[in-house]
């Protein structure tokens, strides 16, 4: 008798792979080989709903939120979220109460929450009133424990001119943003208190924004303070360190206090997909210029790279979808899917009300891409969870645009970046049976809503 199983197999065409697995119980957040998602500029109420309705059922392990702290009011640009005015949890994305409710809802759905933490700097504005009503001026930011004054900022008051100069990168200003003196015990404690406040709301970990601009020793001290507390002991951290050849500051420096995002992975993936050279990806995980797999946060794009063209983005159509399938199928790193909104202007923020609040995301209408709901992402999250713990097996390629590989006896994926169909019989390690292609559909109720592929007793 033929059977439809929740394993995995792929097909031809531009992107194919398989199986939808049930969500596993919530673990301690990454790293646990459950993929995450960044819901960029989504409101807290929208994220809460998405955790319950989509992320939990799909098997996502965690969600990264945009920075939750009070920010400068400049206009509708997305980057105002990255210009802190105070560490109050109040922003154009929602209130403290809404953030706490979101964390509770997500954890109830088996999804942990990671906050994007801006700790390198305050705003780049000369003065004004923050989103929550906090007045500020150049190098003067009030706070509940005294806030920051001129003595709490680095002596270099000019912008970074050379990324070959470590001192400039870590002590001067990043595009005019007022650079905090993170070597100061006072500043370190202020930042640690902010992070612990988020932990008290149930936040599981942090993406440290602009970590490259903070000396690694300073971050180790700050995060050491957080982890010295009972509530912060197991907090997860992934650093944003944009590595570039020939520069003195590299991601590996920051592994003492957390994992690091692997930008080289995303750049390389773009190049190989767009040049139809998927075959060269076979040994990607062993390349010496990449971080060890268990320390690398990987992505196809993030909010910066989708705007500067450094990586693929939703604007690249099929190439982008194919790259996400590969990332979620290939055994390297801790993957995160990026899901933001469509834009034509680099600075354009998410849709907002007349008073500046970001509007709740609406998938299927409006400008939010909802890329995390696509079959190539949501169903592949299930695939990755189903094959967790298996290694790469049965690699095949045609020397160029076509590749296929297995994940032990649990899954198999075939990808074709070429312009013509790839048709062949593949050797797999799968038990005999009928398998559901989860890019064209999904396994549901013992049946397959997409293409079914049969594997014989020899695994072909």
Annotated model-derived regions:
Residues 171-185, 212-223:
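Active-site cleft segment of glycoside hydrolase catalytic domains centered on the general acid/base Glu
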Residues 130-175:
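Core domains of carbohydrate- and sulfate-ester-processing enzymes
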Residues 30-36, 40, 44, 50-56, ...:
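Active-site-proximal helices and loops of the catalytic beta/alpha 8
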Residues 1-28:
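Secretory targeting and sorting signals
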Residues 31, 169-183, 201, 305-308:
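Short glycine/proline-rich turn/loop motifs
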Residues 182-194:
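Alpha-helical scaffold elements lining the catalytic groove of polysaccharide deacetylases
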């Amino acid at each position: 008798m033929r059977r439809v199983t929740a394993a995995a197999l792929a097909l031809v065409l531009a992107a194919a792979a398989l199986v939808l697995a049930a969500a596993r119980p919530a673990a301690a957040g990454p790293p646990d080989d459950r993929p995450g998602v960044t819901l960029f500029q989504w409101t807290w109420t929208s994220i809460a709903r998405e955790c319950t309705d989509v992320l939990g059922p799909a098997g996502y392990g965690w969600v990264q939120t945009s920075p939750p702290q009070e920010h400068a009011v400049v206009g509708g640009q997305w980057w105002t979220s990255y210009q802190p005015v105070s560490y109050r949890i109040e922003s154009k994305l929602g209130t403290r109460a809404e953030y706490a409710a979101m964390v509770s809802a997500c954890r109830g759905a088996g999804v942990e929450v990671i906050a994007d933490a801006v700790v390198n700097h305050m705003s780049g504005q000369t003065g004004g009133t923050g989103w929550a009503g906090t007045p500020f001026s150049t190098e003067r930011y009030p706070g509940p424990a005294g806030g920051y004054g001129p003595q709490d900022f680095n002596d270099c008051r000019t912008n970074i001119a050379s990324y070959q100069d470590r001192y400039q990168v870590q002590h001067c200003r990043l595009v005019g943003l007022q650079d905090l003196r993170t070597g100061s015990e006072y500043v370190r404690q202020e930042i640690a208190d902010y992070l612990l406040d988020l932990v008290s709301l149930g936040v599981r970990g942090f993406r440290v924004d602009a970590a490259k601009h903070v000396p690694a020793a300073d971050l180790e001290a700050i995060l050491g303070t957080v982890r010295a507390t009972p509530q912060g002991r197991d907090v997860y951290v992934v650093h944003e360190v944009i590595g570039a050849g020939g520069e003195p500051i590299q991601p590996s420096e920051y592994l003492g206090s957390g994992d690091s995002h692997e930008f080289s992975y995303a750049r390389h993936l773009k190049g190989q997909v767009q040049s139809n050279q998927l075959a060269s990806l076979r040994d990607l995980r062993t390349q010496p210029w990449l971080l060890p797999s268990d320390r690398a946060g990987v992505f196809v794009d993030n909010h910066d790279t989708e705007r500067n063209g450094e990586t693929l983005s939703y604007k690249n159509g099929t190439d982008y979808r194919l790259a996400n399938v590969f990332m979620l199928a290939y055994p390297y790193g801790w993957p995160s899917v990026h899901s933001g909104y469509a834009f034509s202007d680099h600075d354009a923020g998410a849709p907002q009300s007349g008073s500046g609040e970001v509007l709740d995301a609406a998938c299927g209408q409006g400008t939010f891409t909802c890329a995390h709901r696509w079959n190539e992402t949501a169903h592949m999250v299930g695939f990755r969870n189903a094959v967790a713990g298996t290694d790469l097996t049965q690699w095949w390629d045609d020397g160029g645009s076509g590749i296929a590989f297995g994940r032990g006896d649990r899954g198999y994926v075939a990808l074709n970046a070429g312009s013509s169909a790839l048709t062949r019989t593949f050797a797999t390690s799968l038990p005999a049976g009928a398998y559901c292609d989860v890019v064209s559909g999904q396994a549901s109720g013992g049946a397959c809503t997409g293409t079914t592929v049969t594997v014989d007793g020899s695994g072909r």
